[in-house]
Amino acid sequence: MITMDLMGGYGRVDEQVAIQEAAAAGLRGMEHLILQLSQTGTSERSPAPAQEQQQQVDCREITDMTVSKFKKVISMLNRTGHARFRRGPVVAQSSGPAASEPAPVRSSPSAVSRPMTLDFTKAASGYGKDAGFSVSGISAASSSFLSSVTGDGSVSNGRGGGSSSLMLPPPPATSCGKPPLSSAAAAMSAGAGHKRKCHDHAHSENVAGGKYGSTGGRCHCSKRRKHRVKRTIRVPAISSKVADIPADDFSWRKYGQKPIKGSPFPRGYYKCSTLRGCPARKHVERDPTDPSMLIVTYEGEHRHSPSAAGQDHPPAPPPPLALPLA
């Protein structure tokens, strides 16, 4: 191996020297040709026909010599950079045509497993055979396989296994040259629409059809508390009881109570019960510096007017009048 490398090194040096010599000769010939053409073009008087013919012959010879030198350089450059080993003798081919051509290898169906194929139905007129493409070399997390997608919609999977086909519905027709949305994008758009619907439903004025309206299921809106407008007032307490709070224009229902750190009085939480589904809330606590005063904090806005108090619970009809007996 060392001897072969040394011989290859000497051969490369010789080839480089030969390339340099041929390139230098070609450049000299080009320089001579340019000089000859410049002398011919700058002659003041018209040359004789014999002299003009001689100049044309000289230019042709110089051009041929220059071109041959550069061709030699190109051929030398094409020979460099290849393998160091020489080609072996060509084996004589037999006369029989059957012996020269290798017989195709055929394997039994049981030896080679058939690939799984997915056959899609043909797309609409907007998607023809012009949309054919091929995908190869896809690697999965557990194993790598090759798949190809042809223009007619058939997907070939390189994994071993039985042959199966799956018929899928055609893609929806598009307008204005826009491609159809993928399944993931369609799911995201549907989720965004549902989220918008839930948001509008949560803030609608009239909520009908149960706790979650007519959406056909539980609301998937975010449970995070939204920023609400707060308004705090101080009113005098009407009694020493915690449950007694001064009345206002709306009806309230207590739904919770929480102790306050540093105060012996708890804080009561109320929601508006004037109209079903109203988001207005308030919490009432005693002033720790002046127990005779109450601090009332309102959150949210009412979705109704104070006159709607009797709409949800209509008053009972008056009793029938008793007619005097004759």
Curated annotation (Swiss-Prot):
Keyword DNA-binding on entry: yes
GO terms, biological process: negative regulation of gibberellic acid mediated signaling pathway; response to abscisic acid; response to gibberellin
Q: Name one GO cellular component term.
A: nucleus
Q: What induces it?
A: Induced by abscisic acid (ABA) in aleurone cells. Accumulates in response to uniconazole, a gibberellic acid (GA) biosynthesis inhibitor. Repressed by GA.
In which residue ranges is the amino acid composition biased (Low complexity)? Answer: 97-113
> Which Gene Ontology molecular function entries are recorded, alphabetically?
DNA-binding transcription factor activity; promoter-specific chromatin binding; sequence-specific DNA binding
**Cited Pfam families:** Plant_zn_clust, WRKY
Tell where it localizes. Nucleus
Name the major location: nucleus
Q: Show the segment(s) annotated as Disordered.
A: 87-113, 204-225, 297-326
The short motif Nuclear localization signal is annotated over 70-77
- At the top level, the lineage of the source is Eukaryota
**Expressed in which tissues:** Highly expressed in aleurone cells. In seeds, predominantly present in the plumule, radicle and scutellum of the embryo.
Q: Which UniProt keywords apply?
A: DNA-binding, Nucleus, Transcription, Transcription regulation
Q: What is known of its domains?
A: The WRKY domain is required to bind DNA.
Stated family: Belongs to the WRKY group II-a family.
Name listed for the protein in its UniProt record: WRKY transcription factor WRKY51
Q: Which organism is it from?
A: Oryza sativa subsp. japonica
The lineage, from the top, is: Eukaryota, Viridiplantae, Streptophyta, Embryophyta, Tracheophyta
State the encoding gene: WRKY51
